[in-house]
Amino acid sequence: AIAATMVMGAFASTSTIAAGNNGTARFYGTIEDSPCSIVPDDHKLEVDMGDIGSGILKNNGTSTPKAFQIHLQDCVFDTQTTMTTTFTGNASSTNSGNYYTIYNTDTGAAFNNVSLAIGDAQGTSYKSGAGIEQKIVNDTATNKGKAKQTLDFKAWLVGAADAPDLGNFEANTTFQITYL
């Protein structure tokens, strides 16, 4: 019995330790000359416009505007009082180029008779390259801009006289924020 216990004890003490896992972690970003940082998830915004019936877009109709935001953090303002956000993208040939081209996600072709409008929170649309100005929200105690700011926008589809193409769509723009 003593020998059996010694043998079992030997097996227990020589049990192997499972090998660990190894990997790497990459940390990246950009340091910019700016009073604020864009919240990381807002660098690549995705705005789901939903399913839009073609009937609302006929005869120069518009879809229901979809609100979206860009969030800023770690803001330190000196004398700045406004932020201007400029969206740029391909101007649509529909509606005299006042809006953005939308593309069929299956074929890559531009949609006919419909385009994307981007505007301020009140629903005023802005052409590609035109700045949308918003006031910096101040902290009442310091009378300086708050460390967190939210930029509010809306996007909607604008039809033409004729019926729009049908299918899944996307429009891609870039945006830049300047501080004055």
PLM features: residue spans?
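Mature extracellular/passenger domains of Gram-negative fimbrial/pilin and adhesin proteins
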Residues: T14-L180
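Gram-negative bacterial Sec-dependent N-terminal signal peptides
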Residues: A1-A18
